[in-house]
């Protein structure tokens, strides 16, 4: 079965797994999902990412992060969707929770946080926000 929005599917899998205190979550892999997972690891929202093969297809195994029994991710939400794409210039990139969260941006130089895109002076598609 094909998924209309693979990024929304990834975020939903992470959100659902964290709500039931799962240690790991597995999902189909893609270049974009790997890049988003890398940003989440760098920013400390998930513990680690491993790549595996299941039934001949590449999959990502994400190890979720918890603090005092609660998930580190309070909110993870898709912004730009297939039906309504959201593009912002460097000066208009969203500030999530006054800098305590991140927005993940797809730019011409790759996937990065809003802070990195702002400091590089480039805008792009606002994929999701995490706090």
Curated annotation (Swiss-Prot):
InterPro entries: Ribosomal_uS8, Ribosomal_uS8_CS, Ribosomal_uS8_sf. One of its GO terms (cellular component) is ribosome. Keywords: Ribonucleoprotein, Ribosomal protein, RNA-binding, rRNA-binding. The keyword Coiled coil does not apply. The keyword Ribosomal protein applies. Belongs to the universal ribosomal protein uS8 family. This is Small ribosomal subunit protein uS8. It comes from Acidithiobacillus ferrooxidans (strain ATCC 23270 / DSM 14882 / CIP 104768 / NCIMB 8455) (Ferrobacillus ferrooxidans (strain ATCC 23270)). The gene is rpsH.
């Amino acid at each position: 079965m094909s998924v209309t929005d693979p990024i929304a599917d990834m975020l939903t899998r992470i959100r659902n797994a964290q709500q039931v205190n799962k240690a790991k979550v597995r999902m189909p892999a893609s270049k974009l999902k790997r890049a988003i997972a890398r940003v989440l690891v760098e920013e400390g929202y998930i513990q680690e990412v491993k790549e595996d093969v299941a039934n001949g297809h590449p999959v990502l195994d994400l190890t979720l992060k918890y603090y005092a029994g609660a998930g580190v991710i309070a909110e993870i939400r898709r912004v730009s969707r297939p039906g309504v794409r959201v593009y912002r210039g460097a000066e208009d990139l969203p500030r999530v929770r006054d800098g305590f969260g991140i927005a993940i941006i797809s730019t011409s130089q790759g996937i990065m946080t809003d802070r990195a895109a702002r400091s590089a002076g480039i805008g792009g598609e606002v994929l999701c926000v995490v706090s």
